[in-house]
């Protein structure tokens, strides 16, 4: 006879696996719908910036990668298009690192291994009835649509182009970002403290994206070198280029009941934000940390689908996600505006922020999840 599940998690990515491991500690019966990973001959370009809060969460389930696959960022440089510049350093904030750039395949492999050794987690090929279903399927979630949840999306006029680059010079554990007109370019240091490769994310105008994807590798790297002011010397592509449309989006409801089935959304199934500050996965991990904590501390007589508990989760997470999304959209629109007046205003603002002391310190610690 099939055992009844307390919680069925639909979605086998980082967010879904982490939630399963957190809930299993409370001896709940968990089903995880997670198809086996598909093998590919192409290198995986994905890397995420994870803050101290996310690091602590993953360490709590013993799934933090080693130093070669979770590169400490000890400094950040952000440059505007007219001399504005903001710098952060771990030393000035008295922390070991500002953030960590995590290799996604390495993290996913550790999470899969941890789940396999958990007796309270059952890997499923298809969803099963459960007291609560948590949807972690990403922004194209079919289950969210099945449950009749509106997902209001606003497209930015940009695509993100991601790739991995080898560099002539070591990255020195510095994350770098440039705002130049319609372009936002970020370099994320990889392969440990002495690494000479970076994860590149280039938010480029929609109209230019096809050209940049089809461009000869050498010509593409020359454009990246120019945009990055040659800071790491000669660059070479070491992965394919991948691209996706950028959008701001949030589900109209994060919890509910459909066809007698209680459900909650988490991660990109609930929200999307612009990647310019690298907060996407941090928000998703904060979702599952909040949900797991609420279920862990519930009164013994409350079921896991208690609507008061789920509403508490929705209120808490919607507030943070909305604030982050507004900040990211505001920054994107500020730097997208053309004209010398706007250019001077935003770069003056960057210089003021650089000299602001307490405000800059507070903003840095917020981004770090401290």
Regions found by a protein language model. Name each.
Residues 2-3, 56-60, 68-147, 152-160:
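Conserved N-terminal helical subregion
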Residues 4-8, 12-74:
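Glycine-rich FAD cofactor-binding loop and adjacent beta-loop-alpha segment at the N-terminus
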Residues 6-7, 30, 131-133, 264:
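Hydrophobic "anchor" residues on beta-strands that sit immediately upstream
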Residues 10, 33, 136, 267, ...:
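Active-site flanking residues adjacent to catalytic metal/cofactor-binding acidic residues
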Residues 58, 133-243:
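Conserved FAD-binding catalytic core of PHBH/FMO-like flavoproteins
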Residues 208-305:
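FAD/FMN-dependent oxidoreductases across multiple families
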Residues 293-370:
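C-terminal helical "tail/cap" subdomain of flavin- and related membrane-associated enzymes
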């Amino acid at each position: 006879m099939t055992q009844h599940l307390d919680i069925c998690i639909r979605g086998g990515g980082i967010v879904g696996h982490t939630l399963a491991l957190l809930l299993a500690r409370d001896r709940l019966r968990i089903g995880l719908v997670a198809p086996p990973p598909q093998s590919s001959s192409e290198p995986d370009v994905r890397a995420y910036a994870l803050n101290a809060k996310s690091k602590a969460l993953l360490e709590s389930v013993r799934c933090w990668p080693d130093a070669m696959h979770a590169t400490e960022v000890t400094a950040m440089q952000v440059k505007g298009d007219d001399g504005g510049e903001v710098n952060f350093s771990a030393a000035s904030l008295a922390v070991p690192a500002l953030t960590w750039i995590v290799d996604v395949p390495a993290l996913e492999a550790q999470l899969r291994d941890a789940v396999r050794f958990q007796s309270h987690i059952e890997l499923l090929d298809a969803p099963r009835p459960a007291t609560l279903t948590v949807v972690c399927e990403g922004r194209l979630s079919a289950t969210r649509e099945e449950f009749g949840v509106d997902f209001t999306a606003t497209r930015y006029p940009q695509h993100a182009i991601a790739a991995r680059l080898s560099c002539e010079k070591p990255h020195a554990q510095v994350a770098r970002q440039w705002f130049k007109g319609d372009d936002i370019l970020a370099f994320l240091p990889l392969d440990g403290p002495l690494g000479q490769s970076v994860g590149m994310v280039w938010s480029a105008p929609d109209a230019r994206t096809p050209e940049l994807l089809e461009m000869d590798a050498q010509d593409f790297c020359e454009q990246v070198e120019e945009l990055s002011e040659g800071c790491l010397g000669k660059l070479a592509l070491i992965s394919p280029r991948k691209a996706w449309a950028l959008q701001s989006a949030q589900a109209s409801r994060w919890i509910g009941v459909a066809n007698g089935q209680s459900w909650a959304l988490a991660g990109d199934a609930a929200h999307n934000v612009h990647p310019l500050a690298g907060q996407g996965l941090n928000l998703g991990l904060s979702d599952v940390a909040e949900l797991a904590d609420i279920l862990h501390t519930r009164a013994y007589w409350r079921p896991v689908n208690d609507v008061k508990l789920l509403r508490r989760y929705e209120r808490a997470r919607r507030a943070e996600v909305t604030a982050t999304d507004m900040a990211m959209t505001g920054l994107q629109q500020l730097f997208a505006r053309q004209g010398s007046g706007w250019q001077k205003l935003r770069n003056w603002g960057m210089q003021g922020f650089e000299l602001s002391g307490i405000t800059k310190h507070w903003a840095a610690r917020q981004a770090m999840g401290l």
